[in-house]
Regions:
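Short, charged/polar N-terminal "headpieces" of proteins
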Residues: 1-19
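A structural detector for beta-sheet-dominated domains
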Residues: 12, 24-26, 80
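Short, flexible N-terminal segments of the mature chain
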Residues: 18-44
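Acidic, low-complexity intrinsically disordered segments
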Residues: 36-86
Length: 86
């Protein structure tokens, strides 16, 4: 089972609401996690959102289910959407 690192992320959207999501990565690298968060936010039209280590912080490591491992092998990361995400 692939081990992944979970970064808990809270970002303010353009309309002012808070988006909560996790960034899953295969490498425990805080800067990479922030870059991945920015990439995903840009892809949904929220590229101006502030993402720093304050908004995106390491939470824990865990085993990855197959669909997550597949996405990480393909893209380097997986976004797990929680509150306020489109």
């Amino acid at each position: 089972v692939m081990e992944i690192h979970v970064y808990d992320t809270y970002v303010k959207a353009k309309d002012g609401h808070t988006m909560h999501f996790d960034v899953f990565t295969a490498v425990k690298d805080d800067q990479k996690a922030i870059e991945y968060a920015k990439q995903w936010l840009t892809s949904i039209g929220e590229g101006d959102a502030a993402v720093t280590s304050k908004e995106c912080s390491f939470c824990h490591s865990q085993g990855a289910p197959d669909n997550v491992a597949d996405a990480i092998n393909k893209d380097g990361y997986f976004i797990y959407k929680m509150e306020g995400c489109k």
